[in-house]
Curated annotation (Swiss-Prot):
Primary residence: cytoplasm
Record-level GO cellular component terms: cytosol
HAMAP family attached to this UniProt entry: Pyrrolid_peptidase
Similarity section: Belongs to the peptidase C15 family.
Descriptive protein name: Pyrrolidone-carboxylate peptidase
Enzyme Commission designation: 3.4.19.3
SUPFAM superfamilies for this protein: Pyrrolidone carboxyl peptidase (pyroglutamate aminopeptidase)
Signal sequence extent: none
InterPro entries (UniProt xref): Peptidase_C15, Peptidase_C15-like, Peptidase_C15-like_sf, PGP-I_bact-type, PGPEP1_Cys_AS, PGPEP1_Glu_AS
Keywords, in A-Z order: Cytoplasm, Hydrolase, Protease, Thiol protease
Domain of life: Bacteria
């Protein structure tokens, strides 16, 4: 099994991005699967262009995109990506699309095809906080998740794809009182646990357990 893992460069005035720092620490093999980690720019279309190049060349069995969600208290596999860019802040090249479809020929939304409930369970088993998230936002993270699912549907129809947000690293909250953060090694362990579940459930349906929210 081959798994493509992506991490964004820093954005929004941050000097580092825990997504990129964490994937740099991943081993080359997890649970027998070959892991390829790539950096993607926090730029709307360019992030998808880089992803497409690697999907076409690597032909992965699964794509896991990782992104920073400052303020979240644990690792959060995303349930759905919507066909809409609505940027609260500009991306790293100054693009700020508002109410713009990501793909004119794409679906209104794509649900993650990764075993998100099993991923949460595996992260919990590693002793780390995790939960299913029902919104990936409308910035570059949602954009890349949507593009990943669109591209896999077009170029690797038997592959799975999805996205997981992670919290700030400790170093990022020194001047942000009362903001949640995690140690980088723990973030990396959580990603490894999620990948272990992706491999473990490659030929099985996801766990049937509560992961929803009331609001």
């Amino acid at each position: 099994m081959k798994i493509l893992v992506t991490g964004f460069d820093p954005f929004g005035g941050e000097a580092i991005n825990p997504a990129l720092e964490a994937i740099k620490k991943l081993p080359a093999t997890i649970h027998g699967a070959e892991i390829k980690c790539i950096e993607v720019p926090t730029v709307f279309q360019k992030s998808a262009d880089v992803l497409q190049q690697h999907i076409e060349s690597f032909q992965p069995d699964a794509v896991l995109c990782i992104g920073q969600a400052g303020g979240r208290t644990g690792l959060t596999p995303e349930r759905v990506a919507i066909n809409q860019d609505d940027a609260r802040i500009p991306d790293n090249e100054g693009n700020q699309p508002i109410d713009t479809p990501i793909r004119a020929d794409g679906k209104a939304a794509y649900f993650s095809t990764l075993p998100i409930k099993a991923m949460v369970a595996a992260i919990h088993q590693a002793g780390l906080p995790a939960s299913v998230s029902n919104t990936a936002g409308t910035f570059v993270c949602n954009h890349l998740m949507y593009q990943a699912l669109y591209l896999v549907d077009k170029y690797c129809p038997n592959a799975k794809a999805g996205f997981m947000h992670i919290p700030f690293m400790m170093e990022q909250v020194v001047d942000k009182p009362n903001t949640a953060a995690m140690n980088l090694d723990d973030i990396t362990r959580g990603i490894e646990a999620a990948i272990f579940a992706i491999v473990d459930f490659k030929d099985r349906s996801d766990l049937k357990r509560v992961g929803g929210a009331t609001h």
